[in-house]
């Protein structure tokens, strides 16, 4: 099949967002559904279809979503209202918008490797400890259906 | 530009510690955060202002609670019906009126708007329901905010925008707040004014009195 000439193609924009917390591995398809629901909830089916949105990358705590040019504000608003994906509480922090994926990839920082810490017991619940940059510590409840999250800093752990 | 965010609880009531919420607020473009804590603090470059939230149906109880206020506390009164709002807004020491979107449409009317403007009492725009409500309930909140915006443009009472976050996952950046406020027709300049208006509300200017 002959590809569509460049002038006939839809102009696209890409939006980079950080996924908070960054450890759950979320599938692109699940992310797409969550964003699609947010867009439909805010703007309806008609406007949602005009956005031509898609998730082109998800991993390392980042997400790159695509939309048609001129609708990146709508996509960023929809990303701001997503609070849960596949039963996990998350937040998307929009960082940048660009015309190319390459430009956004340059803005993605590699996650800093931290020495692993032992599991911690808080109020009778055992948490997995994830140490992040700037002394931030994320605690995630251990178990298959873990839901409980705690967001602390090193100082809070020392005070305990 | 000194942007202020309002949050409602930190660890152990919420899932994020005070330090973590303050750090997150700094990363999201705020330099002051209001939290129901006992003492003011500065963490990194972000100032923490202590707040007290009064939630009652009786004006008498609000007056009693205002008497127990510590200096430097931001007094936030949760809105009730029309008579409650009209009774509370003129009280000295009330800084912010929150939760107007939870009340009936006529609870905050043009009389309350004029009173709020005269007494320099801020009316809060809580972004939390926009994130967590869906469908008809979110539409109702958006309608209330659009109504408030109309009154604000007419009577010019202070607007204070806040995420009212209970966790770092509920906190939003200045840019995201601008986008969310655009949902009910707020302009970017109005959002910036709403994020920077708290110092003006806290330092209420009293009428000039001639002392002989």
Curated annotation (Swiss-Prot), chain A:
**Family per record:** Belongs to the eukaryotic/archaeal RNase P protein component 2 family.
| Keywords linked to the UniProt accession | Cytoplasm, Endonuclease, Hydrolase, Nuclease, tRNA processing
Gene name, Swiss-Prot/TrEMBL: rnp2
Any GO BP: tRNA 5'-leader removal
GO cellular component terms, alphabetically, are:
cytoplasm; ribonuclease P complex
Which InterPro entries did the record assign? Pop5/Rpp14/Rnp2-like, Rnp2-like_sf
- SUPFAM superfamilies tied to this protein: Rnp2-like (SSF160350)
Q: Which HAMAP family match?
A: RNase_P_2 (MF_00755)
Keyword Ribonucleoprotein (UniProt)? no
Query: What highest taxon heads this organism's lineage?
Result: Archaea
Keyword Nuclease recorded: yes
Please identify the protein, giving its name as recorded. Ribonuclease P protein component 2
Give one GO molecular function term: ribonuclease P activity
Q: What class of enzyme is it?
A: hydrolase
């Amino acid at each position: 099949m002959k590809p569509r000439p460049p002038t006939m193609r839809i102009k696209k924009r890409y939006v980079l967002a950080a996924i908070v917390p960054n450890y759950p591995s979320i599938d692109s398809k699940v992310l797409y559904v969550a964003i699609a629901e947010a867009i439909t909830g805010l703007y309806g089916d008609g406007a949602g279809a005009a956005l031509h949105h898609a998730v082109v990358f998800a991993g390392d705590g980042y997400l790159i979503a695509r939309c048609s040019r001129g609708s990146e504000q709508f996509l960023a608003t929809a990303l701001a209202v997503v609070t849960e994906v596949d039963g996990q509480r998350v937040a998307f922090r929009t960082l940048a918008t660009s015309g190319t994926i390459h430009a956004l990839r340059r803005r993605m920082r590699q996650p800093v490797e931290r020495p692993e810490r032992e599991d911690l017991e808080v109020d009778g619940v055992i948490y997995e400890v994830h140490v992040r940059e700037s002394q931030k510590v994320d605690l995630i409840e251990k178990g298959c259906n873990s839901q409980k999250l705690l967001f602390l800093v090193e100082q809070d752990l020392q005070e305990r | 530009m000194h942007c202020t965010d309002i949050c409602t609880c930190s660890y152990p009531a919420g899932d994020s510690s005070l330090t973590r919420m303050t750090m997150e607020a700094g990363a999201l473009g705020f330099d002051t955060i209001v939290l129901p804590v006992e003492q003011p603090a500065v963490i990194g470059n972000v100032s923490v202002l202590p707040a007290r939230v009064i939630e009652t149906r009786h004006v008498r109880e609000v007056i009693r609670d205002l008497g127990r206020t510590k200096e430097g506390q931001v007094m936030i009164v949760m809105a009730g019906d029309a008579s409650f709002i009209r009774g509370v807004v003129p009280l000295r020491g009330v800084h912010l009126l929150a939760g107007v979107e939870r009340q009936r449409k006529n609870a905050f009317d043009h009389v309350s708007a004029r009173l709020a403007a005269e007494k320099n009492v801020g009316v809060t725009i809580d972004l939390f329901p926009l994130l967590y409500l869906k469908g008809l309930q979110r539409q109702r909140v958006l309608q209330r905010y659009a109504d408030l915006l109309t009154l604000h443009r007419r009577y010019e009472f202070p607007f204070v925008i806040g995420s009212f976050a209970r966790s770092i996952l509920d906190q939003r950046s200045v840019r995201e707040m601008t986008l969310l406020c655009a949902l009910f027709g707020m302009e970017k300049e109005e959002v910036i004014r709403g994020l920077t208006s708290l110092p003006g509300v806290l330092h209420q200017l009293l009428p000039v009195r001639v002392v002989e």
